[in-house]
């Protein structure tokens, strides 16, 4: 049985070791997990797009599923910012800092693009300061 910790739509990034190493990105939507196979994983540089191959939807139980050949690389929730027939723009909120991506349809397949984070991005404003450490300035001329 699957227990949900939040009302926000969930995501999971599975790492597969067989039959060949790849990742699966799964986004909760309308009671299922929409899924894309990522042969090279999530992009880490906005200048580099990664192939994302749409695969059949999975049951929500896959949010917590792992076995000898499949492990959970990351999990959390996601928020959609924009969508049309050719693209989905969203932020993943997982174990790392939030990251905004665009899934871009290229015909039969998709490209996954890491977007540059903007200071005025509401996700950054809400979550971007979690590693901020305030500091005090001191007068170095005082003895």
Give the ranges of each region predicted by the language model:
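A charge-rich, low-complexity, intrinsically flexible signal that marks solvent-exposed coils, linkers
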Residues: 1-143
């Amino acid at each position: 049985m699957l227990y949900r910790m939040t009302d926000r739509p969930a995501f999971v990034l599975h790492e597969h070791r067989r039959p060949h190493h790849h990742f699966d990105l799964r986004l909760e939507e309308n009671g299922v997990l929409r899924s894309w196979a990522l042969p090279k994983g999530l992009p880490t540089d906005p200048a580099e797009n990664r192939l994302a191959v749409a695969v059949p939807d999975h049951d929500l139980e896959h949010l917590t599923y792992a076995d000898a050949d499949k492990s959970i690389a990351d999990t959390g929730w996601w928020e959609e910012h924009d969508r049309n027939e050719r693209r989905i723009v969203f932020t993943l909120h997982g174990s790392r800092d939030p990251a905004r991506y665009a899934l871009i349809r290229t015909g039969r397949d998709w490209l996954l693009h890491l977007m540059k984070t903007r200071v005025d991005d509401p996700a950054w404003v809400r979550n971007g300061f979690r590693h901020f450490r305030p500091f005090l300035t001191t007068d170095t001329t005082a003895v």
